Every structure is written in C-alpha cells, then in structure tokens.
Curated annotation (Swiss-Prot):
Residues 11-227 form the DHFR domain. Keywords: NADP, One-carbon metabolism, Oxidoreductase. It comes from Cryptococcus neoformans var. neoformans serotype D (strain JEC21 / ATCC MYA-565) (Filobasidiella neoformans). Key enzyme in folate metabolism. Catalyzes an essential reaction for de novo glycine and purine synthesis, and for DNA precursor synthesis. The keyword S-adenosyl-L-methionine does not apply. Pathway: Cofactor biosynthesis; tetrahydrofolate biosynthesis; 5,6,7,8-tetrahydrofolate from 7,8-dihydrofolate: step 1/1. This is Dihydrofolate reductase. NADP(+) binds at residues 17, 23-29, 64-66, 86-88, 127-134. One of its GO terms (molecular function) is dihydrofolate reductase activity. Belongs to the dihydrofolate reductase family. CDD domains: DHFR. Its EC number is 1.5.1.3. GO terms for biological process: dihydrofolate metabolic process; folic acid metabolic process; one-carbon metabolic process; tetrahydrofolate biosynthetic process. One of its GO terms (cellular component) is mitochondrion.
Length: 229
C-alpha cells in the first residue's frame, strides 16, 4: 500500500481523462472505451499492494452521478474505500466499504478519524465535473505563500494538490468539461499548476509508465500536474 504522510491538510489527487478541449464526459458516461486506460486508473487508485484491511485502503471520492455511472457489477470499486458526495443522499444498497457524505470536508474529517496515526492512505478524486471544478478553484485551505511572500494578496490553494491527467489526443464529442486548471493564475500572475517531469510522475506512482499510448486508434498521454509552490 502506498501511503502519504498525515497532516492537517490531507493530500488529494484528482484522476481524470480529458480531451484537448477538456471534454471529460458524454450523456453521463465516458465518451471513449479504452480498457488500457481503465487498467491504469485502477492500478493508480488501488495502489501496488492494497491492504486487506479496508481502513488502510486508498480512498476514491466521487459524486453521485459518477457512482451511478459505474456498472453495478463493478460497484463499489474493489480494494478501495468508496466515498460518495451528495447533498441529496444516495442509496448504496449492500455496497461494502462505501459511505455517503454531504460534502468533501465532511468526508475528510471522517477519514482522518478512521485512519491510523502516522500515515494515511492516498485519497483520489475521480469525478464528476462539478466536484472537479469546486476542488480546482481556490478554497479555504491555508495559503501557499510564506510570510515573506511579495504577493499582493493571499492565495488560498485548491482543495486538491495533484492531478493525474490522461490527455486524450483524439477528438471526441463531449457535454461535460474539466475546469481549465492550466490557465489558473495566482494574484502575482504566476501559474497555480505546473506539469511534473515524467521521472517525477513515475516515482510518485511507483512504476515505469509509458508517456504516450495508442489504443484502438486513440492516442493519449499520461501527465502529472502539481501545485506550483
């Protein structure tokens, strides 16, 4: 199990596949069928050696529509703690290792109280568009700027601090879109996000991933973006 040091501000990684125009969905599902990309998603979010103890497994946070878009035979996503965010509630049926919360802060508070001290499982945000958008915009998370910063205004960082982006290079029709995070800037004009090197990406996920893949005639590249601190 891959873990990350516990802190007052949990590290949250968004995992998303998007076209060059930032399209991520169509009619409540994915516009593409790429088994290899789905295997990558499962491997990243599960971790290389998932624990048999549910309380130590990685966490996947998703909105209600994303939960419902997963075929019932695959719900909950196995070897991961499934967290569904919904203000209206969701009937999870008999799904094990799955919980509903009204918002992400409530989920994070509960997760902190149920994980062992010292280290915490990795936390992944997996959709949909509404949660991605709210988590990419500046939040109440403490400022990234130090006390000696010359920035004219304080900057409240986004809720997430890492993005694993699969950039789909082929065109697809979409009706749901990812926030254009790469264009976000701080008050001093610097970029909020920076693209990590492929070396840094491989070190973080723990295996030697190919940077570009072609599957079923569709080309896509794997990228990791981190907060520009």
């Amino acid at each position: 199990m891959q873990t990350t040091a516990k802190s007052s501000t949990p590290s949250i990684t968004a995992v998303v596949a998007a076209t060059a125009e930032n399209g991520i969905g169509l009619n409540g599902g994915l516009p593409w069928r790429l088994p290899g990309e789905m295997k990558y998603f499962a491997r990243v979010t599960t971790g290389e050696t998932p624990s048999s103890d549910p309380s130590e497994q990685n966490v996947v946070i998703m909105g209600r529509k994303t939960w419902e878009s997963i075929p019932s035979r695959f719900r909950p996503l196995k070897n991961r703690r499934n967290v569904v965010i919904s203000g209206k509630g969701v009937d999870l049926g008999t799904a094990e290792n799955s919980t509903v919360y009204t918002d992400i802060p409530s989920a994070l508070s509960a997760l902190r109280s149920t994980t062992e001290s010292g280290h915490s499982p990795r936390i992944f945000l997996i959709g949909g568009a509404t949660l991605y958008t709210s988590s990419l915009l500046p939040s109440s998370v403490p400022s990234l700027n130090s006390s000696t910063s010359t920035s004219p205004l304080p900057f409240s960082r986004p809720l997430i601090d890492r993005i694993l982006l699969t950039r789909i290079l082929s065109p697809f029709e979409c009706d749901a879109y990812l926030e254009d995070f790469a264009a976000h800037t701080k008050p001093d004009g610097s970029k909020v996000w920076k693209k990590a090197s492929i070396k840094e990406f491989r070190e973080w996920i723990g295996w030697d991933i190919e940077e570009q893949v072609e599957e079923k005639g569709v080309k896509y590249i794997f990228e990791m973006w981190v907060l520009n601190q």
